[in-house]
Amino acid sequence: MLEAGPLRLDPATREVERDGREIELSAREFALLEAFMRRPGQVLTQGQLLEAAWDAGYEQRSNVVEVYVRYVREKIDRPFGAEGIETVRGVGYRLRKDGGGA
């Protein structure tokens, strides 16, 4: 079980919840969130996120990482009035260690 504040992710059952409420994620969204939750507080580059959630030979030619990070934010942050995933301009993204607050 991975935890960051009120956010919980179980890699074995592929379940995600925040404040006790289950959150449905696609396989790719789950892979992105798992990458963040394995390294809370650490900045992950777009390359690292691509490696975590896309096939090895995938070449980024668009804003696909930005789009999927937005999808994850819309599911784990917005409904709860939280800001767990932060943009670090020019570098990448980071999941706050507190998961965006209690």
Segments predicted by a language model, with ranges:
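Basic, amphipathic DNA-recognition helix from helix-turn-helix-like DNA-binding domains
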Residues: 1-3
